[in-house]
From Swiss-Prot:
Keyword Iron-sulfur recorded: no
Record-stated family: Belongs to the CidA/LrgA family. LrgA subfamily.
Organism: Bacillus subtilis (strain 168)
Topology class, membrane: Multi-pass membrane protein
Protein name per Swiss-Prot or TrEMBL: Antiholin-like protein LrgA
Amino acid sequence: MSAKKVYGFLTQAFIFAVIMLVSNMIAAIVPIPIPASVVGLVLLFLLLCLKVIKLEQVETLGTSLTSLIGFLFVPSGISVMNSLGVMQQYGLQIVLVILLATIILLGATGLFSQLILSLSGKRKTEADMKTKTVQSPQNNNELVHH
């Protein structure tokens, strides 16, 4: 059994800082307005999947940051509070748009999933039929004689 190597706080913070620096550069270059934090999450995920970064190298700091997530969302809550006038004026319309968009999204996702399942089912059935035809050519002769 090999023991996990323990990485220090500064090492983990440096890894996160480099990822955020690169993600800020990518977000600035890409013409699509994607937040640098989202680019950073995707970049970290890819680096972990490709085993460029080991989980142990970022796990402790990542867990610590996750435990602080409520505190990190306080600025968003304050921003909503600053927009309270807009929320009071258009609150019902905002809620209705969110509900309508959610229903449309769920419906479209369901229909698209059914379409993919039916197409993959047809392909599987066609593949099964071809396999049966190739495996038993004598059955085809019997069908022709009848």
